[in-house]
A protein has these predicted regions:
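Aromatic- and kink-enriched transmembrane "portal" helix at the membrane-lumen/periplasm boundary
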Residues: 83, 87-90, 104-108, 112-118, ...
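Alpha-helical transmembrane segments
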Residues: 25-26, 116-120
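Hydrophobic transmembrane alpha-helices
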Residues: 58, 93, 97, 119-127, ...
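Start-transfer (signal-anchor) and selected internal transmembrane alpha helices
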Residues: 1-36, 124, 172
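Transmembrane-helix signature of polytopic, membrane-embedded enzymes
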Residues: 105, 122-143, 177-180
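Extracytosolic helix-loop segments that constitute the early lumenal/periplasmic catalytic or substrate-binding loops
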Residues: 33-38, 50-80, 88
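Alpha-helical transmembrane signal-anchor/signal-peptide segments
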Residues: 38-45
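Membrane-interface starts of transmembrane alpha-helices
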Residues: 12, 102-110, 131-133
């Protein structure tokens, strides 16, 4: 019991990390975009790559597989074939997409969820204290490009989340090795 109490005193618990990540992303979004989230429409045209990616994810959610939408060339493909994202990435977006439903901006909502999970897991695994969490948020806010690409229909949020998970897990393993050795 003492170990748990000491751990909670030194580092925020997972729920606080998740809450902090959500508050940070909401603050970032409203400071940068000043548009209510329910009024966001990302693509400029229906042939935009982000709209095509969204259609692929929606077709996986509604039909169980892609319905022939590719990206980049704004062309169509055979039904059941995956485009440039490939099946792994489409299904990686379709699974959290089940939480949000088959809507117009399902990829945006998945991106926001993925980056929030990445930041929260990194902060928890790296055992950042409150001041370090604030510094992390300040650093992410100052470079801004990774966060801007997460508020989109592109797949960069998945890449950033995976990078944060890998670095956070490596920090946790390093700390555990120091304690054990």
């Amino acid at each position: 019991m003492q170990k748990i109490r000491t751990c909670l005193q030194k580092t925020p618990n997972a729920l606080l990390c998740a809450l902090g990540a959500v508050v940070f992303l909401a603050g970032f979004y409203f400071l940068c975009y000043r548009t209510p989230l329910n009024e966001v429409w990302l693509p400029t045209t229906m042939n935009n790559d982000e709209a095509l990616y969204n259609r692929q994810v929606v077709s996986v959610l509604t039909h169980g597989g892609p319905q022939g939408y590719f990206g980049y060339q704004e062309s169509t493909a055979d039904i059941g074939r995956y485009g440039t994202w490939g099946p792994l990435l489409i299904w990686a977006y379709a699974l959290p997409g089940l939480l949000f439903g088959a809507g117009v901006n399902v990829v945006l909502w998945c991106n926001l969820l993925l980056i929030a999970v990445g930041v929260a897991v990194f902060a928890h695994c790296a055992r950042l204290n409150y001041w370090q969490c604030i510094a992390l948020c300040g650093a992410l806010f100052s470079i801004m490009l990774p966060l801007r690409s997460c508020v989109s229909g592109a797949s960069e949020a998945m890449h950033y989340m995976l990078a944060l998970l890998i670095v956070g897990t490596a920090a946790a393993c390093t700390a555990a090795a120091r304690l054990a050795g």
